């Protein structure tokens, strides 16, 4: 599989990762181990990836793992030619823990909270990791493939 310049740079510096190829826009996707994510995130920030475009999470497969996905941007040669990379960090469902990157990219705040709320990934060292969309009393993680929808009845306004 063809590797991009970032993957080659990480190999040169003996940083453990796996290239997952390129998307339709030519953006390389890298898989990083959860235990290595905080140090690799610092490396990427120092190297110029100072903008977290988006972060999301998804359930890979029933009984499988969960993924936290980060889209990072580096603007080196002008705003018309940004360099982007996609990082996927996987965690097991039985103990889904990933280091938070809030302290590197502040825009991760609400995005990691939403991923926690919907998928159940705990982001270590996040300053305000609590539900953001669902009530605090909600049980379960609504976007997991094994989620069972609770029985509830809609209360309608009489007007």
Curated annotation (Swiss-Prot):
It is a peripheral membrane protein. It comes from the Eukaryota. It catalyses: a plastoquinone + NADH + (n+1) H(+)(in) = a plastoquinol + NAD(+) + n H(+)(out); a plastoquinone + NADPH + (n+1) H(+)(in) = a plastoquinol + NADP(+) + n H(+)(out). Gene3D superfamilies: NADH:ubiquinone oxidoreductase, 30kDa subunit (3.30.460.80). GO terms for cellular component: chloroplast thylakoid membrane. PROSITE patterns: COMPLEX1_30K. It is found in: Plastid, Chloroplast thylakoid membrane. Keywords: Chloroplast, Membrane, NAD, NADP, Plastid, Plastoquinone, Quinone, Thylakoid, Translocase, Transport. InterPro entries: NADH_DH_suC (IPR010218), NADH_quin_OxRdtase_su_C/D-like (IPR037232), NADH_UbQ_OxRdtase_30kDa_su (IPR001268), NADH_UbQ_OxRdtase_CS (IPR020396). GO terms for molecular function: NADH dehydrogenase (ubiquinone) activity; quinone binding. Its EC number is 7.1.1.-. Pfam families: Complex1_30kDa (PF00329). GO terms for biological process: photosynthesis, light reaction. Its main location: plastid. Belongs to the complex I 30 kDa subunit family. NDH is composed of at least 16 different subunits, 5 of which are encoded in the nucleus. NDH shuttles electrons from NAD(P)H:plastoquinone, via FMN and iron-sulfur (Fe-S) centers, to quinones in the photosynthetic chain and possibly in a chloroplast respiratory chain. The immediate electron acceptor for the enzyme in this species is believed to be plastoquinone. Couples the redox reaction to proton translocation, and thus conserves the redox energy in a proton gradient. This is NAD(P)H-quinone oxidoreductase subunit J, chloroplastic. The lineage of its organism: Eukaryota, Viridiplantae, Streptophyta, Embryophyta, Tracheophyta.
């Amino acid at each position: 599989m063809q590797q991009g310049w970032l993957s080659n740079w990480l190999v040169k510096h003996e940083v453990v990762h796996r290239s997952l190829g390129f998307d339709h826009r030519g953006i390389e996707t890298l898989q990083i181990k959860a235990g290595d994510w905080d140090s690799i995130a610092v490396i990427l920030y120092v190297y110029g990836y100072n903008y977290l475009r988006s972060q999301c999470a998804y359930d890979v497969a029933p009984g499988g793992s969960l993924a936290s996905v980060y889209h990072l941007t580096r603007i080196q040669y002008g705003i018309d030619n940004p360099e982007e990379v996609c990082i996927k960090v996987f965690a097991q469902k039985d103990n889904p823990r990933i280091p938070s990157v809030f302290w590197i990219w502040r825009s991760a705040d609400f995005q990691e909270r939403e991923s926690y709320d919907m998928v159940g990934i705990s982001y270590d060292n996040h300053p305000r990791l609590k539900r953001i969309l669902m009530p605090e009393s909600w049980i379960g993680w609504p976007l997991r493939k094994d989620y069972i929808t609770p029985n509830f009845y809609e209360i309608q306004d009489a007007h």
